[in-house]
Amino acid sequence: DLFKVFNVVRNHLKDGGLFLLDCFNPNIQYIVEGEKEQKEIAAYTTDDGREVLIKQKMRYENKTQINRIEWHYYINGKFNSIQNLDMRMFFPQELDSYLKWNGFNIIHKYGGFGEEAFNDNSEKQVFVCQ
C-alpha cells in the first residue's frame, strides 16, 4: 500500500531530510494504442550472437488503474517466453495529493531526471519532497 510506504519513509526521514520519488506520468494515448496490437519495442543481438526481439502488448484496467503489460520474447525468430509487468498508474494530481495528505511538502516536481519542468508531455514525475 502506497500510504504505508509513505509512512515508513516519513518516519525514517531526518528533520529537513529529502525524499526523492520518481514515477511514470501516465500517457493515455500510448496505453490505448498499446491495447490495439502487439508492437515491437526492442531488438538486439546478445554477446553470444542470439537475435532477440521483444514485442509488447498492454491492457489497462480503469477500475484498478493498473496497466497490465506483457513482453513476448523471441530468440532467433522463435517464440521463447512471456514476461508480465503489472504497473499501477498514478496520475499527476492524484500523486501530488497523496504526497501532501501523507505529510510531505513538494519542493520540486520535474518531468525527468534532467530536472526539466513537468508538463503535459513529461514521461516521468520526479519529486523532491521534504
Predicted regions mapped to residue ranges:
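Residues at alpha-helix caps and immediate loop-helix transition turns in enzyme cores, especially N-
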Residues: 1-2, 121
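SAM-dependent methyltransferase
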Residues: 20-93
